[in-house]
A protein has these predicted regions:
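Helix-coil boundary and interhelical linker segments in multi-pass alpha-helical membrane proteins
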Residues: 1-5, 57-70, 120-131
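Generic transmembrane alpha-helix signature in multi-pass membrane proteins
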Residues: 21-29, 88-94, 104-106, 113-126
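Hydrophobic core segments of alpha-helical transmembrane domains in multi-pass membrane transport
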Residues: 6, 13, 44, 49, ...
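Cytoplasmic-side transmembrane-helix entry/capping segments in multi-pass membrane proteins
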Residues: 35-46, 70-76, 98-109, 163-170
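C-terminal ends of transmembrane helices
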Residues: 22-36, 84-98, 150-161
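Juxtamembrane boundary at the C-terminal end of a transmembrane helix
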Residues: 2, 182-200
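Structural signature of hydrophobic alpha-helical transmembrane segments
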Residues: 3-18, 67-82, 134-146
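Ordered, amphipathic secondary-structure segments that act as subunit-interaction surfaces
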Residues: 60-103
């Protein structure tokens, strides 16, 4: 049941982009079309989950035993950069159209604070490996969900007349704020589930 709570909390209650405001750059930059958003969500899910597994192992089996915790951020960034390079090579071969659509935002996953933030957060929360994987995958799903919903809204906005003063960045920011407010409606759900299943 603990895994279900982690899953629901990471997707809805503590959504990485809409309530913790990590990963805003790709959220705003790759959300013009749903198909691009799906591709970016998939790339983030792959990198985030795999990076969390590897960084957890690096922390537990290299940094902690040798007292090298001060190298955590540097080590995690190197792992994430290597994974992003791997994803970039795979996408270039498998789906050149998606690779072109993601453009500069694919290499920017390396510096995406959401990926690094999740890797560090699982260490801070002292999750075991399975909890870390569930948390990372759930966080990636939450990011993808927010990105796809936002892209769908932006596609619909392109079909309607928007007042001149609200065009461009203004309507994007207002829409992102409203989406964030909508996700705030899930706050307290994890606490309710904890009390329902007697996990408090």
């Amino acid at each position: 049941m603990e895994y279900l709570l982690i899953f629901i909390s990471a997707i809805f209650v503590n959504n990485i982009v809409l309530s913790q405001f990590l990963g805003i750059c790709p959220f705003l930059g790759v959300s013009k079309k749903v198909d691009t958003a799906i591709g970016m969500g998939g790339a983030i899910a792959f990198v985030l989950t795999l990076a969390t597994i590897i960084t957890w192992c690096v922390q537990k089996y290299v940094l902690d035993p040798f007292g090298l915790q001060y190298l955590q951020t540097l080590a995690f960034i190197l792992v994430i950069a290597a994974l992003v390079q791997m994803v970039e090579i795979i996408l270039k071969k498998v789906s050149p159209a998606l690779y072109q659509a993601l453009g500069i935002f694919l290499p920017l996953i390396t510096t995406n604070c959401a990926v690094l933030g999740v890797a560090i957060r699982v260490i801070q929360k002292d999750y075991n490996l399975l909890e870390s994987v569930v948390y990372a995958f759930s966080t990636a799903l939450g990011f993808a969900l927010a990105l796809i919903v936002f892209a769908g809204i932006r596609e619909q906005q392109a079909l309607v007349r928007i007042p001149k003063g609200m065009q461009g960045v203004a309507i994007v920011m207002v829409t992102a704020a409203l989406l964030s407010l909508a996700f705030m409606g899930f706050s307290g759900v994890d606490g309710g589930l904890k009390s329902l299943f007697g996990l408090e």
